[in-house]
Amino acid sequence: MTDPDSTSPAPDPQQPADPQPTDPGRREVLRQGALLTATALGLGGGLTLLTRRPAPAEPAPDPQTAAGRVIRPTGPYDTQEAMTGYRDMTTYNNFYELGLGKDDPARHAGALPTRPWTVVVDGEVKKPVTLDIDTLQSWFPLEDRIYRMRCVEGWSMVMPWFGFPLAALLRRLEPTGAARYVQFTAINAPDKLPGQRPWVLEWPYTEGLRLDEALHPLTLLAVGLEGRSLPAQNGAPLRLVVPWKYGFKGIKAIVRMTLTRTQPQTTWALAAPDEYGFYANVNPAVPHPRWSQATEQRIGESGRRPTLPFNGYGEQVAGLYSGLDCGGTSKWRAARPPMRGSVQASCWAGYSPPFSCCGTR
Protein backbone atom coordinates (compact mmCIF):
# COMPACT_ATOMS: atom_id res chain seq x y z
CA MET A 1 0.00 0.00 0.00
CA THR A 2 1.09 3.55 -0.67
CA ASP A 3 1.57 6.20 1.96
CA PRO A 4 -1.67 8.20 2.36
CA ASP A 5 0.31 11.35 3.06
CA SER A 6 2.16 11.32 -0.27
CA THR A 7 1.78 14.27 -2.61
CA SER A 8 0.90 12.30 -5.75
CA PRO A 9 -2.30 13.29 -7.59
CA ALA A 10 -5.41 11.48 -6.39
CA PRO A 11 -8.22 10.03 -8.51
CA ASP A 12 -11.29 12.06 -9.40
CA PRO A 13 -14.19 11.54 -6.95
CA GLN A 14 -17.36 9.79 -7.98
CA GLN A 15 -20.15 12.25 -8.53
CA PRO A 16 -23.45 11.61 -6.74
CA ALA A 17 -26.70 13.08 -7.98
CA ASP A 18 -27.03 16.85 -8.04
CA PRO A 19 -28.59 18.29 -4.88
CA GLN A 20 -31.62 20.54 -4.90
CA PRO A 21 -30.92 24.23 -4.21
CA THR A 22 -32.72 26.05 -1.45
CA ASP A 23 -35.28 28.76 -2.03
CA PRO A 24 -33.93 32.26 -2.87
CA GLY A 25 -35.33 33.63 0.40
CA ARG A 26 -32.33 32.17 2.22
CA ARG A 27 -30.22 35.13 1.13
CA GLU A 28 -32.52 37.56 2.95
CA VAL A 29 -32.29 35.36 6.05
CA LEU A 30 -28.50 35.61 5.85
CA ARG A 31 -28.51 39.37 5.39
CA GLN A 32 -30.77 39.88 8.38
CA GLY A 33 -28.91 37.34 10.49
CA ALA A 34 -25.57 39.02 9.88
CA LEU A 35 -26.85 42.20 11.53
CA LEU A 36 -27.85 40.32 14.67
CA THR A 37 -24.91 37.94 15.05
CA ALA A 38 -22.85 40.00 17.47
CA THR A 39 -25.67 40.44 19.99
CA ALA A 40 -28.22 37.66 19.56
CA LEU A 41 -26.08 34.54 19.90
CA GLY A 42 -25.06 34.48 23.55
CA LEU A 43 -26.26 30.98 24.32
CA GLY A 44 -24.68 28.42 26.59
CA GLY A 45 -23.12 24.54 26.72
CA GLY A 46 -18.85 23.07 28.84
CA LEU A 47 -15.94 20.78 28.18
CA THR A 48 -17.30 18.12 30.50
CA LEU A 49 -17.98 14.42 30.29
CA LEU A 50 -19.14 13.87 26.74
CA THR A 51 -22.25 11.98 27.90
CA ARG A 52 -23.19 14.78 30.28
CA ARG A 53 -25.34 17.52 28.75
CA PRO A 54 -24.51 20.86 30.41
CA ALA A 55 -27.23 23.39 31.04
CA PRO A 56 -26.90 26.53 28.90
CA ALA A 57 -25.77 29.73 30.59
CA GLU A 58 -28.76 31.50 29.04
CA PRO A 59 -31.95 30.00 27.59
CA ALA A 60 -31.45 28.77 24.05
CA PRO A 61 -33.96 29.88 21.43
CA ASP A 62 -37.04 27.76 20.97
CA PRO A 63 -36.31 25.57 17.93
CA GLN A 64 -39.80 26.24 16.58
CA THR A 65 -39.20 29.99 16.45
CA ALA A 66 -35.42 30.24 16.15
CA ALA A 67 -34.91 27.92 13.20
CA GLY A 68 -36.18 28.35 9.68
CA ARG A 69 -37.59 25.97 7.13
CA VAL A 70 -35.39 23.06 6.08
CA ILE A 71 -35.84 21.64 2.59
CA ARG A 72 -35.03 17.94 2.74
CA PRO A 73 -32.55 17.20 -0.05
CA THR A 74 -32.25 13.92 -1.92
CA GLY A 75 -29.78 11.04 -2.12
CA PRO A 76 -26.60 11.23 -0.02
CA TYR A 77 -27.41 14.83 0.92
CA ASP A 78 -29.93 13.64 3.53
CA THR A 79 -29.33 10.92 6.13
CA GLN A 80 -33.07 10.22 6.49
CA GLU A 81 -32.53 10.38 10.26
CA ALA A 82 -34.04 12.62 12.90
CA MET A 83 -32.14 15.89 13.12
CA THR A 84 -30.46 16.90 16.35
CA GLY A 85 -32.38 19.57 18.26
CA TYR A 86 -31.47 23.19 17.58
CA ARG A 87 -30.63 23.81 21.23
CA ASP A 88 -28.13 20.94 21.27
CA MET A 89 -26.58 21.98 17.95
CA THR A 90 -25.99 25.52 19.17
CA THR A 91 -25.00 24.96 22.82
CA TYR A 92 -22.79 21.87 22.66
CA ASN A 93 -19.83 22.88 20.53
CA ASN A 94 -16.09 22.62 20.06
CA PHE A 95 -14.73 25.98 18.90
CA TYR A 96 -11.55 26.60 20.85
CA GLU A 97 -11.08 30.15 19.67
CA LEU A 98 -14.08 30.91 21.90
CA GLY A 99 -13.02 28.72 24.83
CA LEU A 100 -12.38 25.14 25.91
CA GLY A 101 -15.79 24.35 27.37
CA LYS A 102 -18.68 22.95 25.39
CA ASP A 103 -20.74 25.95 26.46
CA ASP A 104 -18.00 28.53 25.91
CA PRO A 105 -18.58 29.02 22.15
CA ALA A 106 -22.23 29.90 22.73
CA ARG A 107 -21.45 32.05 25.78
CA HIS A 108 -18.76 34.00 23.94
CA ALA A 109 -20.41 34.02 20.51
CA GLY A 110 -20.73 37.79 20.54
CA ALA A 111 -16.93 38.10 20.62
CA LEU A 112 -16.65 36.76 17.06
CA PRO A 113 -17.01 39.65 14.59
CA THR A 114 -18.69 38.19 11.50
CA ARG A 115 -19.18 41.44 9.54
CA PRO A 116 -17.25 42.85 7.81
CA TRP A 117 -15.59 39.58 6.77
CA THR A 118 -13.07 39.06 3.99
CA VAL A 119 -12.18 35.73 2.39
CA VAL A 120 -9.00 35.19 0.37
CA VAL A 121 -8.49 32.37 -2.13
CA ASP A 122 -4.93 32.22 -3.41
CA GLY A 123 -1.97 29.97 -4.15
CA GLU A 124 -2.09 27.55 -7.08
CA VAL A 125 -5.18 29.07 -8.65
CA LYS A 126 -5.51 30.96 -11.92
CA LYS A 127 -7.99 33.52 -10.60
CA PRO A 128 -7.06 34.45 -7.02
CA VAL A 129 -9.62 36.60 -5.25
CA THR A 130 -10.13 38.68 -2.14
CA LEU A 131 -13.79 39.36 -1.51
CA ASP A 132 -16.31 39.93 1.24
CA ILE A 133 -18.45 37.07 2.50
CA ASP A 134 -21.72 38.46 1.13
CA THR A 135 -20.30 38.71 -2.38
CA LEU A 136 -18.98 35.16 -2.09
CA GLN A 137 -22.40 33.87 -1.03
CA SER A 138 -24.06 35.66 -3.95
CA TRP A 139 -22.00 33.68 -6.47
CA PHE A 140 -23.75 30.36 -5.89
CA PRO A 141 -27.22 28.93 -5.22
CA LEU A 142 -27.48 27.83 -1.60
CA GLU A 143 -28.25 24.16 -0.97
CA ASP A 144 -29.59 22.23 2.00
CA ARG A 145 -27.50 19.31 3.25
CA ILE A 146 -28.49 17.13 6.22
CA TYR A 147 -25.28 15.40 7.32
CA ARG A 148 -24.06 13.28 10.19
CA MET A 149 -21.30 14.90 12.25
CA ARG A 150 -18.99 12.57 14.21
CA CYS A 151 -16.54 13.97 16.77
CA VAL A 152 -13.47 11.98 17.77
CA GLU A 153 -14.53 12.40 21.39
CA GLY A 154 -17.20 9.77 20.72
CA TRP A 155 -20.34 11.86 20.19
CA SER A 156 -22.32 12.72 17.09
CA MET A 157 -25.17 14.83 15.72
CA VAL A 158 -27.33 15.05 12.59
CA MET A 159 -27.08 18.64 11.37
CA PRO A 160 -29.05 20.50 8.65
CA TRP A 161 -26.57 22.84 6.98
CA PHE A 162 -27.02 25.08 4.02
CA GLY A 163 -24.30 26.53 1.86
CA PHE A 164 -22.57 25.79 -1.44
CA PRO A 165 -20.17 23.09 -2.65
CA LEU A 166 -16.51 23.94 -2.24
CA ALA A 167 -16.07 22.47 -5.72
CA ALA A 168 -18.20 25.26 -7.21
CA LEU A 169 -15.83 27.89 -5.83
CA LEU A 170 -12.66 26.08 -6.80
CA ARG A 171 -13.81 25.38 -10.35
CA ARG A 172 -14.81 29.01 -10.81
CA LEU A 173 -11.33 30.13 -9.77
CA GLU A 174 -9.54 27.37 -11.76
CA PRO A 175 -6.84 25.49 -9.83
CA THR A 176 -3.56 25.25 -11.70
CA GLY A 177 -2.20 21.91 -12.84
CA ALA A 178 0.21 21.99 -9.90
CA ALA A 179 -2.51 22.20 -7.23
CA ARG A 180 -2.78 19.08 -5.07
CA TYR A 181 -4.15 20.33 -1.73
CA VAL A 182 -6.22 23.10 -0.18
CA GLN A 183 -5.12 24.71 3.08
CA PHE A 184 -7.75 26.50 5.16
CA THR A 185 -6.98 29.24 7.68
CA ALA A 186 -9.34 30.53 10.36
CA ILE A 187 -9.60 33.92 12.01
CA ASN A 188 -6.74 35.03 14.25
CA ALA A 189 -7.92 37.76 16.63
CA PRO A 190 -6.60 37.19 20.17
CA ASP A 191 -7.65 40.72 21.10
CA LYS A 192 -11.28 39.66 20.54
CA LEU A 193 -11.47 35.88 20.91
CA PRO A 194 -11.02 34.68 24.52
CA GLY A 195 -9.85 31.21 23.54
CA GLN A 196 -6.87 32.61 21.64
CA ARG A 197 -5.48 34.56 24.59
CA PRO A 198 -4.06 31.62 26.58
CA TRP A 199 -1.47 29.45 24.86
CA VAL A 200 -3.43 26.30 24.04
CA LEU A 201 -2.89 25.78 20.31
CA GLU A 202 -0.82 27.56 17.71
CA TRP A 203 -3.13 30.12 16.14
CA PRO A 204 -4.54 30.62 13.63
CA TYR A 205 -6.25 27.27 13.32
CA THR A 206 -5.41 25.60 10.03
CA GLU A 207 -6.75 22.56 8.21
CA GLY A 208 -6.30 20.90 4.86
CA LEU A 209 -7.81 18.59 2.28
CA ARG A 210 -6.47 16.80 -0.72
CA LEU A 211 -7.75 18.52 -3.86
CA ASP A 212 -9.97 15.61 -4.88
CA GLU A 213 -11.49 15.62 -1.38
CA ALA A 214 -12.14 19.35 -1.71
CA LEU A 215 -13.78 18.81 -5.11
CA HIS A 216 -16.02 15.99 -3.89
CA PRO A 217 -19.73 16.91 -4.12
CA LEU A 218 -20.31 16.14 -0.43
CA THR A 219 -17.78 18.78 0.68
CA LEU A 220 -19.65 21.92 1.66
CA LEU A 221 -18.88 25.50 2.62
CA ALA A 222 -21.68 26.18 5.09
CA VAL A 223 -23.17 29.61 5.73
CA GLY A 224 -26.31 28.54 7.59
CA LEU A 225 -27.80 26.01 9.99
CA GLU A 226 -31.39 24.80 10.12
CA GLY A 227 -32.74 27.47 7.83
CA ARG A 228 -31.12 30.50 9.42
CA SER A 229 -27.81 32.33 9.35
CA LEU A 230 -24.95 30.29 10.79
CA PRO A 231 -24.54 30.98 14.53
CA ALA A 232 -21.13 32.23 15.61
CA GLN A 233 -20.60 29.23 17.89
CA ASN A 234 -21.04 26.94 14.88
CA GLY A 235 -18.36 28.70 12.85
CA ALA A 236 -19.94 31.80 11.30
CA PRO A 237 -19.81 33.20 8.81
CA LEU A 238 -18.14 30.44 6.77
CA ARG A 239 -17.14 26.93 7.80
CA LEU A 240 -16.10 23.71 6.13
CA VAL A 241 -18.25 20.57 6.36
CA VAL A 242 -16.70 17.23 5.32
CA PRO A 243 -19.16 14.64 6.64
CA TRP A 244 -17.03 11.52 6.25
CA LYS A 245 -14.22 12.93 8.41
CA TYR A 246 -13.97 13.58 12.14
CA GLY A 247 -15.33 16.95 13.14
CA PHE A 248 -12.00 18.75 13.60
CA LYS A 249 -11.60 18.82 9.81
CA GLY A 250 -14.59 21.18 9.71
CA ILE A 251 -12.61 24.37 10.26
CA LYS A 252 -14.71 27.33 11.38
CA ALA A 253 -14.61 31.06 10.68
CA ILE A 254 -12.56 30.66 7.49
CA VAL A 255 -10.62 33.68 6.22
CA ARG A 256 -8.28 32.08 3.68
CA MET A 257 -8.11 29.10 1.33
CA THR A 258 -4.74 28.46 -0.30
CA LEU A 259 -4.19 25.86 -2.99
CA THR A 260 -0.81 24.20 -2.55
CA ARG A 261 1.50 21.71 -4.26
CA THR A 262 2.38 19.91 -1.04
CA GLN A 263 0.41 18.62 1.92
CA PRO A 264 -0.20 21.51 4.33
CA GLN A 265 0.52 21.35 8.03
CA THR A 266 -2.60 21.32 10.17
CA THR A 267 -3.18 22.48 13.73
CA TRP A 268 -3.95 19.18 15.45
CA ALA A 269 -1.34 17.19 13.54
CA LEU A 270 1.24 19.68 14.82
CA ALA A 271 -0.14 19.73 18.36
CA ALA A 272 -0.41 15.96 18.85
CA PRO A 273 1.16 14.11 15.89
CA ASP A 274 0.88 10.70 17.56
CA GLU A 275 -2.89 11.12 17.86
CA TYR A 276 -4.14 13.21 14.94
CA GLY A 277 -3.30 12.62 11.30
CA PHE A 278 -4.07 14.51 8.13
CA TYR A 279 -6.83 12.30 6.76
CA ALA A 280 -9.01 11.81 9.87
CA ASN A 281 -11.58 9.67 8.08
CA VAL A 282 -14.17 8.21 10.45
CA ASN A 283 -13.08 4.62 11.04
CA PRO A 284 -14.61 2.51 13.83
CA ALA A 285 -11.86 -0.10 13.39
CA VAL A 286 -9.04 2.32 14.25
CA PRO A 287 -9.13 3.48 17.88
CA HIS A 288 -7.81 6.75 19.13
CA PRO A 289 -4.74 5.95 21.26
CA ARG A 290 -6.81 6.64 24.38
CA TRP A 291 -10.32 5.39 23.54
CA SER A 292 -12.31 3.27 21.12
CA GLN A 293 -14.00 4.69 18.04
CA ALA A 294 -16.29 1.68 17.58
CA THR A 295 -19.39 3.40 19.01
CA GLU A 296 -20.73 6.90 19.53
CA GLN A 297 -23.22 8.81 21.66
CA ARG A 298 -25.78 10.60 19.49
CA ILE A 299 -26.55 13.83 21.32
CA GLY A 300 -30.17 13.80 22.40
CA GLU A 301 -30.36 10.00 22.55
CA SER A 302 -29.70 7.51 25.33
CA GLY A 303 -27.22 4.69 24.89
CA ARG A 304 -24.58 4.33 22.21
CA ARG A 305 -24.80 3.34 18.57
CA PRO A 306 -22.22 1.70 16.28
CA THR A 307 -20.04 4.10 14.33
CA LEU A 308 -20.21 3.64 10.56
CA PRO A 309 -17.08 3.55 8.35
CA PHE A 310 -16.63 6.94 6.70
CA ASN A 311 -19.53 8.04 8.94
CA GLY A 312 -21.93 6.23 6.62
CA TYR A 313 -20.66 7.87 3.41
CA GLY A 314 -18.44 5.02 2.23
CA GLU A 315 -20.42 4.41 -0.94
CA GLN A 316 -19.67 7.96 -2.05
CA VAL A 317 -16.07 8.41 -0.86
CA ALA A 318 -14.29 5.08 -0.30
CA GLY A 319 -12.96 5.19 -3.86
CA LEU A 320 -10.92 8.28 -3.00
CA TYR A 321 -8.66 6.13 -0.82
CA SER A 322 -8.27 3.00 -2.91
CA GLY A 323 -4.86 1.47 -2.22
CA LEU A 324 -4.05 3.85 0.61
CA ASP A 325 -3.26 2.70 4.15
CA CYS A 326 -5.35 5.36 5.89
CA GLY A 327 -5.23 3.47 9.16
CA GLY A 328 -1.47 3.07 9.46
CA THR A 329 0.72 5.77 11.00
CA SER A 330 4.31 4.55 10.92
CA LYS A 331 5.21 6.23 7.64
CA TRP A 332 3.19 9.30 8.55
CA ARG A 333 4.97 9.70 11.87
CA ALA A 334 8.38 9.24 10.30
CA ALA A 335 7.63 11.85 7.65
CA ARG A 336 6.32 14.49 10.03
CA PRO A 337 8.59 17.40 11.06
CA PRO A 338 9.32 17.96 14.75
CA MET A 339 6.47 19.56 16.67
CA ARG A 340 6.63 23.33 16.90
CA GLY A 341 4.74 23.42 20.16
CA SER A 342 2.49 20.66 21.36
CA VAL A 343 -0.53 21.23 23.54
CA GLN A 344 0.54 21.39 27.17
CA ALA A 345 -0.63 18.42 29.22
CA SER A 346 -1.99 20.80 31.84
CA CYS A 347 -4.49 22.09 29.29
CA TRP A 348 -6.41 18.82 29.32
CA ALA A 349 -5.72 17.49 32.79
CA GLY A 350 -8.93 16.58 34.58
CA TYR A 351 -11.13 16.33 31.51
CA SER A 352 -12.81 13.13 30.36
CA PRO A 353 -12.28 12.30 27.59
CA PRO A 354 -8.95 14.14 27.42
CA PHE A 355 -9.00 17.55 25.79
CA SER A 356 -9.14 17.15 22.05
CA CYS A 357 -10.79 18.50 19.00
CA CYS A 358 -11.76 15.83 16.52
CA GLY A 359 -9.89 13.38 14.34
CA THR A 360 -7.51 10.49 14.65
CA ARG A 361 -5.00 8.96 12.32
UniProtKB/Swiss-Prot annotation:
As for subcellular location, the record says: Cell envelope
Report the cofactor remark.
Binds 1 Mo-molybdopterin (Mo-MPT) cofactor per subunit.
Reactions catalysed, semicolon-separated, are:
L-methionyl-[protein] + a quinone + H2O = L-methionyl-(S)-S-oxide-[protein] + a quinol; L-methionyl-[protein] + a quinone + H2O = L-methionyl-(R)-S-oxide-[protein] + a quinol
**Which of this chain's residues are annotated to bind Mo-molybdopterin?**
93, 96-97, 151, 234, 239, 250-252
Q: Which PROSITE patterns does UniProt cross-reference here?
A: TAT (PS51318)
Source domain of life is Bacteria
InterPro entries noted in UniProt: MsrP, OxRdtase_Mopterin-bd_dom, OxRdtase_Mopterin-bd_sf, TAT_signal
Leader sequence range is 1-57
Q: Name one GO cellular component term.
A: cell envelope
Q: Which cofactor does it need?
A: Mo-molybdopterin
Annotated GO molecular function terms are: metal ion binding; molybdopterin cofactor binding; oxidoreductase activity, acting on a sulfur group of donors, quinone or similar compound as acceptor
Q: Residue ranges under compositional bias (Pro residues)?
A: 10-22
Catalytic EC class: oxidoreductase
Q: Which UniProt keywords apply?
A: Metal-binding, Molybdenum, Oxidoreductase, Signal
Protein modification: Predicted to be exported by the Tat system. The position of the signal peptide cleavage has not been experimentally proven.
Q: CDD domains annotated for this entry?
A: YedY_like_Moco (cd02107)
- Tell me which EC number(s) this protein carries: 1.8.5.-
What does this protein do, in the record's words? Part of the MsrPQ system that repairs oxidized cell envelope proteins containing methionine sulfoxide residues (Met-O), using respiratory chain electrons. Thus protects these proteins from oxidative-stress damage caused by reactive species of oxygen and chlorine. MsrPQ is essential for the maintenance of envelope integrity under bleach stress, rescuing a wide series of structurally unrelated cell envelope proteins from methionine oxidation. The catalytic subunit MsrP is non-stereospecific, being able to reduce both (R-) and (S-) diastereoisomers of methionine sulfoxide.
Q: Which HAMAP family match?
A: MsrP
Q: How does it assemble?
A: Heterodimer of a catalytic subunit (MsrP) and a heme-binding subunit (MsrQ).
Q: Per the similarity annotation, which family is this? A: Belongs to the MsrP family.
**What protein does this entry describe?**
Protein-methionine-sulfoxide reductase catalytic subunit MsrP
* Naturally occurring in which organism (per UniProt): Deinococcus radiodurans (strain ATCC 13939 / DSM 20539 / JCM 16871 / CCUG 27074 / LMG 4051 / NBRC 15346 / NCIMB 9279 / VKM B-1422 / R1)
